[in-house]
C-alpha cells in the first residue's frame, strides 16, 4: 500500500518546470562552470572578508519547440517583398533578418523604417491563419502615419485591420476577436492585456515604433513582459533612429524587448549613403556680446566668496566663477542630502551653498546661450523671491543674503533694464544670425519653403518669434510651437506679502483686508483682460497667448495645418517638435541651442532631407560646440561597439519550422480603393476617422451635429484572466488539497476518497421534529394525519396584506362546545388615532358565512387589495375590517415579518393602547435579538403545540354553525407530552424557531 508521504509529495521537477515556464514552447538549459580563483588570506590562513574563492560561469542554452500558432503551410514556401517602391539593399537585408528573429532596426530618419515593418507584417499575415499582428506607436499622429504607410504598402484588406486608441472601449472585445491587424498605442495594448480582452497567446507579430522609449517601466516594457509570461512564439520588430545614448542604455532596450539582432545604419554606411538626400551642415560660432561679458564678470565677482567657501568645504570643484555649472551643483546637493553620516546642521549649510551655485549656474547658462532678455527674467524673479522672503523673516539663509544683497547685483539690474528699454536692442548674437539666415534662405528659395528653429526654453522661443517678426518683412511668417503645459508663473511679491502680513484681530481690519483682496483680484483680472486684448492686436499675439496658456492638441493640429498650407513658413519649436509629429517637409533646420544628448541632436537634424535636399544650421556659443562634438563622437563610438557585437542578445523563436526556408518573391502589390483613399489623406483625425469607419464596417458619412443619446447598457462580458496551460482555473477548496487516511482493522492507513469521506453528524432534537416550521399549513397537515375525520371540503382563503396573496387554509379547528368571541371595532371616525379595538382580549363574535360565500366574495378582495388605509387614516377600511372579523381563526394567524412600528399614533403623539404597546415591545425585542424574549417565546410555543397535539377530538366547521360570543374558554391546564429532559434540551439549544 502506498505510504502517506507518496500522497503528499511535491511535483516532479519536470512538472514544476512546466508550470514555471507557463507551458510555453521555450526551454532553457543552464550549465554552471566553477573555477577556483586565488584569494588573499591573513596570517592564520583565513580568507579575508569579501573575497570570492570560486568563479562561476553560467551558460544558458535556449531552445524552442513547435509554435502553437496555426500556420498556412501553402504560403510558407516564400515571402513577399513589395516592389511598389524602389528596392533598396539595406531594406531588403533587414526585412529578411527581421522575419526570422527579433530585430532592433536603427536607421536614420526618413530611410524607410515603416516599409520594413509593413513588409514583415504582411508576411506574417500570410503565414498565419488566425494570429494577431500589432503595430504600436506612442502618439496618435504616429499611429495615423503608420496606418497610411502600412495600408498603402501592403494592401492588407481594411476589413481585417483595426485602429485602437484610448478614447473609447466600445466593442473592444469584439474587435480583438474578429480582426487580425491592429494599430494602437502601447497604453491601449497594455490595458487590454491586463483586462483580459486580448489573449497574449494570439499575438504572432509585434512592431514597436520609437523603441528607444522602452526603458524602465514604460508601456512598451510592460507589454513585452506580459506577453512573455504566456507566449514565446512571436516576432518582435523594434524601430528607432537612435537606440540610446550609451552602451548601457542599448543593453537595457535589448533586454526589455528580447532583441536577438541589431541592424544599425548611419548616414555614412556604405549601403545607405547612396539613398541619402544631401544635408548640408553649417556650424556657426557666435561670440558673446560685450554687454553679456560685462554681466558675467559682475556675477562672478558677487558669487566668488560663496564659490570659494564651497571649494574649501570640498563640496564643489575648483573653477572660475564664470564656469559654474548648474547640473554639477545639483548633483552634489543630491549626494549630500542622501548621505546620512553628515550632521544635519552641516548638511543643510552645504545644501544651501550648492543651491545658490545652482541658481547662479542657471543665470550664466541663460546669459551665454539665450541672451540678456531670457537671463533678466530669471534673474529678477530669483532676486525678488529671496529678498521678499528674507525681509518678512521667512528665510534666514545668510549665505544667499550675502549674494542677493550684494551691491553689484543692483548695478546688474539697472544695466539690464536700460538695455531692454531700447526696442532695437538685440539680446544675443544668435538672434542676428537667425535673421540673416532666414533672409538669405527665403530670397533664394521663396516663401513656399519651410523652416524649423529648435530651442529648449519657451521664453527663448517667444523671443525668437518676436524678433523675427520685428525685423523681417511679410515674406517670413513665424509662429511658436510648444507643449500643452501652462507657463510657470513668476513670483508674485504683492500676493506673497499680503499672505504673510499680520491679519489683524478686529472685525474692521478683517473686513478691510477682504475688501482689499477683492479689489486687487479685480485689478488683476482687468489687467489680464487688457493684456490679452493688446496681444490679440499684434501679429505675434497667438504665439504670446500660446506661450502663457500652452498649446492643446487642437491648437497644435491647427498650427501644423497652417504650416503645411503656407500660412506660417517658420516654426519655432521646443522639444515637442523633435519627434512624434508629422510636420511635413522642411528645407532648413536651425538649432538655436544644442544638447549633450545625441538622440535629441539626431532627431532634430532628421527633420530635413527626407524627400529633398536640406540644410542644417548649428548655432554655437560658449562651450556648446564642444558638447555637440563630444555627443556625436560618443554616438559614433556606440555604433562601432554595437557593430562589434558588444551587446548580450536574447535568442528568439524562429516560428517557421527549421526545415522550411522561404524564398523571396518580389511582387507588385495592388492597393485597393479604400487603402488608396487612406494613403491620400493628410489630416490625422480624418485618417483615424476613416480607418475607424472601415473597421466597424460602416460607410463613411459626412460629419453631423453631435446629439447625446441615452446609452443602452450592454451586457458586459466577465473579465477573463489568462492562465498557464494545464492548470485548474476554478476555486479549489482547502479540503481537496490534502489526502485523508483512516486506520483500518489491520492497523494500516487507508486513503479516504471523496465518496467515503465521513461527514460529521448533526445532533437532532426529536422534540423539534414537529415544531420545525411555523406555517399554518404544516400545523394543519400534521393534525390531519392524526385524525382522518377532518373534512376536505372546508377550505378557507385568507387575504394577506396589500399583495392580495391567498393561502389555502385546509381546515379551521375548534373544540366541541367551545365558542369564539370577537373584537368589537370602535367606529370613532372623529378620533382615528385611538386604539382600533375596544376589547383587548376579545375574539371575533360570529362566523356567519360559509366557505362558498368566502369564495364568492374573492372578487371584492381583488378590488380592495390596494386600499389598506382609508380616508380617515384608520389602519383598515371598514369593509376590510368586517371581512377580517368574519374570517378570523386563532390557529390560522402567524407573523411572517417584523414590522417597524412607531411609538405613537399617526395623527398626534397619543400613546397606543396597552395591547398595541405590548406588540411593539415584542417586535422591538425580536429586532434587537433579545435572548430573554426569544426563550420566553420558545417556551410558550412549545406549550401551545403540545396542547394541540394532545387534542383527541375535533369538530368540523359547518356552514350553518354559529358560535356564541362569549363562550370561549381555553383550558390552559391541559397536559402536554414533552418531558422535562426534552424541554430543557430545547430551551437550552441555540434553535430559534
UniProtKB/Swiss-Prot annotation:
Species per Swiss-Prot/TrEMBL record: Saccharomyces cerevisiae (strain ATCC 204508 / S288c) (Baker's yeast)
Protein's recorded name: ATP-dependent DNA helicase MPH1
Motif (DEAH box) on chain: 209-212
Chain's gene name: MPH1
Keyword Manganese: no
Region (Disordered): 530-551
Pfam families named among the record's database cross-references: Helicase_C, ResIII
Record-annotated Helicase ATP-binding domain positions: 94-261
Reactions performed catalytically: ATP + H2O = ADP + phosphate + H(+)
EC number(s) stated in the UniProt entry for this protein: 3.6.4.12
Amino acid at each position: 500500500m502506498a505510504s502517506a508521504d507518496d500522497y503528499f509529495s511535491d511535483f516532479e521537477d519536470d512538472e514544476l518546470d512546466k508550470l514555471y515556464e507557463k507551458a510555453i514552447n521555450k526551454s532553457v538549459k543552464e550549465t554552471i562552470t566553477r573555477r577556483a580563483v586565488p584569494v588573499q588570506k591573513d596570517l592564520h590562513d583565513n580568507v579575508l572578508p569579501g573575497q570570492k574563492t570560486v568563479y562561476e560561469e553560467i551558460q544558458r542554452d535556449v531552445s524552442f519547440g513547435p509554435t502553437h500558432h496555426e500556420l498556412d503551410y501553402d504560403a510558407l514556401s516564400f515571402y513577399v517583398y513589395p516592389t511598389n517602391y524602389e528596392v533598396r539593399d539595406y531594406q531588403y537585408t533587414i526585412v529578411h533578418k527581421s522575419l526570422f528573429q527579433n530585430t532592433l532596426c536603427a536607421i536614420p530618419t526618413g530611410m524607410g523604417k515603416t516599409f520594413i515593418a509593413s513588409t514583415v507584417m504582411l508576411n506574417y499575415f500570410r503565414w498565419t491563419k488566425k494570429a494577431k499582428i500589432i503595430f504600436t506607436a506612442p502618439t496618435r499622429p504616429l499611429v495615423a502615419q503608420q496606418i497610411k504607410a502600412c495600408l498603402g504598402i501592403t494592401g492588407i484588406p481594411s476589413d481585417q485591420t483595426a485602429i485602437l486608441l484610448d478614447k473609447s472601449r466600445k466593442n473592444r472585445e469584439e474587435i480583438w476577436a474578429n480582426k487580425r491587424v491592429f494599430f494602437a498605442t502601447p497604453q491601449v495594448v497594455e490595458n487590454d492585456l491586463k483586462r483580459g480582452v486580448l489573449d497574449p497567446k494570439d499575438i504572432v507579430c509585434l512592431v514597436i515604433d520609437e523603441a528607444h522609449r522602452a526603458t524602465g517601466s514604460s508601456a512598451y516594457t510592460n507589454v513585452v513582459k506580459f506577453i512573455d509570461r504566456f507566449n514565446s512564439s512571436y516576432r518582435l520588430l523594434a524601430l528607432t533612429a537612435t537606440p540610446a545614448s550609451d552602451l548601457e542604455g542599448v543593453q537595457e532596450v535589448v533586454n526589455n524587448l528580447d532583441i536577438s539582432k541589431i541592424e544599425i545604419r548611419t548616414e555614412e554606411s556604405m549601403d545607405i549613403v547612396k539613398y541619402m538626400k544631401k544635408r548640408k551642415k553649417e556650424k556657426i560660432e557666435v561670440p558673446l556680446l560685450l554687454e553679456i561679458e560685462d554681466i558675467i564678470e559682475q556675477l562672478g565677482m558677487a558669487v566668488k566668496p560663496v564659490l570659494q567657501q564651497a571649494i574649501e568645504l570640498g563640496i564643489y570643484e575648483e573653477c572660475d566663477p564664470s564656469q559654474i555649472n548648474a547640473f554639477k551643483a545639483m548633483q552634489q546637493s543630491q549626494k549630500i542630502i542622501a548621505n546620512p553620516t553628515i550632521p544635519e546642521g552641516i548638511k543643510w549649510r552645504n545644501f544651501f551653498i550648492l543651491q545658490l551655485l545652482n541658481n547662479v549656474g542657471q543665470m550664466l547658462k541663460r546669459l551665454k546661450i539665450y541672451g540678456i532678455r531670457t537671463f533678466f527674467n530669471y534673474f529678477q524673479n530669483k532676486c525678488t523671491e529671496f529678498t521678499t522672503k528674507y525681509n518678512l523673516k521667512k528665510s534666514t539663509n545668510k549665505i544667499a543674503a550675502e549674494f542677493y544683497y550684494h551691491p553689484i547685483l543692483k548695478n546688474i539690474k539697472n544695466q539690464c533694464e536700460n538695455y531692454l528699454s531700447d526696442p532695437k536692442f538685440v539680446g544675443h548674437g544668435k538672434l542676428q544670425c537667425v535673421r540673416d539666415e532666414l533672409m538669405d534662405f527665403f530670397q533664394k528659395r521663396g516663401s513656399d519653403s519651410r523652416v524649423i528653429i529648435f530651442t529648449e526654453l519657451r521664453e527663448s522661443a517667444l523671443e525668437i518669434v518676436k524678433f523675427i517678426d520685428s525685423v523681417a518683412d511679410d515674406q517670413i511668417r513665424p509662429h511658436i510651437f510648444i507643449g500643452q503645459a501652462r507657463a510657470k508663473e513668476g513670483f508674485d511679491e504683492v500676493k506673497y506679502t499680503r499672505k504673510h502680513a499680520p491679519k489683524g484681530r478686529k472685525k474692521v481690519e478683517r473686513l478691510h483686508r477682504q475688501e482689499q483682496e477683492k479689489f486687487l483680484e479685480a485689478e488683476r483680472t482687468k489687467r489680464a483682460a487688457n493684456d490679452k486684448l493688446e496681444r490679440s492686436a499684434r501679429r505675434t499675439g497667438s504665439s504670446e497667448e500660446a506661450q502663457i496658456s500652452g498649446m492643446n492638441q487642437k491648437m497644435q493640429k491647427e498650427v501644423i495645418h497652417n504650416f503645411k498650407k503656407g500660412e506660417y513658413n517658420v516654426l519655432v519649436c521646443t522639444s515637442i517638435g523633435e519627434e512624434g509629429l508629422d510636420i511635413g517637409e522642411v528645407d532648413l533646420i536651425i538649432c538655436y541651442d544644442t544638447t549633450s544628448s545625441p538622440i535629441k541632436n539626431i532627431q532634430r537634424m532628421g527633420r530635413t532631407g527626407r524627400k529633398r535636399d536640406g540644410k542644417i544650421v548649428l548655432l554655437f556659443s560658449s562651450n556648446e560646440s564642444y558638447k555637440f562634438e563630444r555627443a556625436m563622437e560618443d554616438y559614433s563610438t556606440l555604433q562601432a561597439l554595437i557593430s562589434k557585437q558588444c551587446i548580450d542578445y536574447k535568442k528568439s523563436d524562429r516560428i517557421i519550422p527549421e526545415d522550411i526556408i522561404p524564398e523571396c518573391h518580389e511582387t507588385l502589390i495592388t492597393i485597393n480603393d479604400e487603402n488608396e483613399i487612406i494613403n491620400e489623406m493628410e489630416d490625422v483625425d480624418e485618417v483615424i476617422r476613416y480607418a475607424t469607419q472601415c473597421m466597424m464596417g460602416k460607410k463613411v458619412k459626412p460629419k453631423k451635429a453631435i446629439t447625446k443619446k441615452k446609452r443602452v447598457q450592454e451586457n458586459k462580458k466577465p473579465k477573463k484572466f489568462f492562465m498557464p496551460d494545464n492548470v485548474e482555473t476554478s476555486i479549489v477548496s482547502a479540503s481537496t488539497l490534502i489526502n485523508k487516511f483512516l486506520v483500518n482493522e489491520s492497523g494500516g492507513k487507508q486513503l479516504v476518497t471523496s465518496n467515503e469521506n465521513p461527514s460529521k453528524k448533526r445532533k437532532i432534537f426529536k422534540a423539534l421534529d414537529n415544531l420545525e416550521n411555523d406555517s399554518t399549513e404544516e400545523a394543519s397537515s400534521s393534525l390531519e394525519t392524526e385524525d382522518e375525520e377532518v373534512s376536505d371540503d372546508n377550505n378557507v382563503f385568507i387575504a394577506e396584506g396589500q399583495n392580495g396573496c391567498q393561502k389555502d387554509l385546509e381546515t379551521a379547528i375548534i373544540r366541541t362546545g367551545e365558542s369564539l368571541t370577537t373584537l368589537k371595532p370602535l367606529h370613532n371616525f372623529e378620533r382615528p388615532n385611538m386604539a382600533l379595538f375596544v376589547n383587548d382580549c376579545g375574539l371575533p363574535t360570529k362566523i356567519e358565512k360559509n366557505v362558498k360565500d368566502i369564495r364568492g366574495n374573492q372578487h371584492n378582495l381583488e378590488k380592495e387589495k390596494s386600499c389598506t388605509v382609508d380616508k380617515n387614516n384608520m389602519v383598515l377600511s371598514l369593509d376590510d375590517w368586517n371581512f377580517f372579523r368574519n374570517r378570523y381563526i386563532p390557529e390560522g394567524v402567524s407573523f411572517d415579518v417584523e414590522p417597524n412600528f412607531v411609538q405613537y399614533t399617526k395623527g398626534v403623539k397619543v400613546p397606543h393602547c396597552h395591547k398595541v404597546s405590548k406588540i411593539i415591545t415584542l417586535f422591538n425585542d425580536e429586532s434587537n435579538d433579545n435572548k430573554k424574549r426569544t426563550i420566553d417565546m420558545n417556551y410558550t410555543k412549545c406549550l401551545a403545540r403540545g396542547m394541540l397535539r394532545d387534542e383527541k377530538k375535533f369538530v368540523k366547521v359547518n356552514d350553518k354553525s354559529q358560535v356564541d360570543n362569549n363562550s370561549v374558554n381555553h383550558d390552559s391546564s391541559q397536559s402536554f407530552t414533552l418531558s422535562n429532559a426534552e424541554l430543557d434540551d430545547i430551551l437550552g439549544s441555540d434553535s430559534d424557531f
